[in-house]
């Protein structure tokens, strides 16, 4: 199963879409065969499968770009494609942080509505966690306190090891420092929204 072409391509796009180097693979494509010179009038095109080099990863993560170079539509499209929520988020918190304990980039979203299962026992909070552009955890719960469990987004740090386990993450000093920093950023943004954007803050209050 894991050696199937589209399975391999899917794994690359999920876990290594944002590493800095191109990942290429021979991918099958349907191509029309040349029409014979003596083809009859009712000739129907024939197709064959050919294999061509295709770059599977996009290489340039949106969160690595400067905020001033990213449009609101790009932020919203990324949110829709990553988190399958087609309502425009109320807020985007995009920041680059340098610290003695850990340096990281984060891109967080305050949704306009609660996830459909938010109030059920099956809901799993957490942010996507990347190490140098490689996804190492899809939902890292340790990055968010329970009361900010509705926040969606990701964190990327070059200070984390690619082969770190879930058990090691729970005791990782760098991850704890990142979590504390994120909590402060979210609180600050919500207070700012309460003061400067009352309409959206009231939408947030009703949703959560």
Each PLM stretch: what is its role?
Residues 1-208:
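Long, intrinsically disordered, charge-dense linkers/tails
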């Amino acid at each position: 199963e894991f050696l199937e072409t589209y399975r391999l391509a899917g794994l690359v796009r999920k876990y290594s879409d944002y590493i800095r180097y191109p990942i290429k693979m021979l991918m099958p494509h349907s191509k029309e065969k040349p029409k014979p010179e003596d083809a009859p009038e009712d000739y129907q095109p024939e197709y064959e499968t050919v294999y061509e080099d295709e770059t599977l990863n996009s290489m340039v993560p949106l969160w690595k770009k400067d905020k001033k170079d990213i449009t609101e539509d790009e932020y919203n499209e990324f949110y829709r494609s990553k988190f399958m929520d087609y309502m425009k988020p109320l807020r985007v918190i995009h920041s680059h942080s340098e610290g003695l304990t850990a340096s990281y980039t984060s891109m967080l979203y305050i949704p306009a509505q609660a996830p459909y299962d938010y109030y059920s026992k099956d809901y799993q909070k957490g942010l996507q966690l990347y190490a140098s552009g490689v996804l190492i955890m899809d939902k890292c719960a340790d990055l968010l306190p329970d009361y900010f469990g509705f926040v969606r987004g990701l964190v990327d740090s070059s200070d984390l090891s690619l082969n770190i386990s879930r058990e090691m993450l729970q005791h990782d000093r760098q991850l704890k420092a990142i979590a504390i920093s994120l909590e402060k950023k979210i609180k600050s943004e919500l207070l700012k929204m309460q003061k400067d954007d009352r309409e959206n803050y009231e939408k947030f209050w009703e949703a959560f």
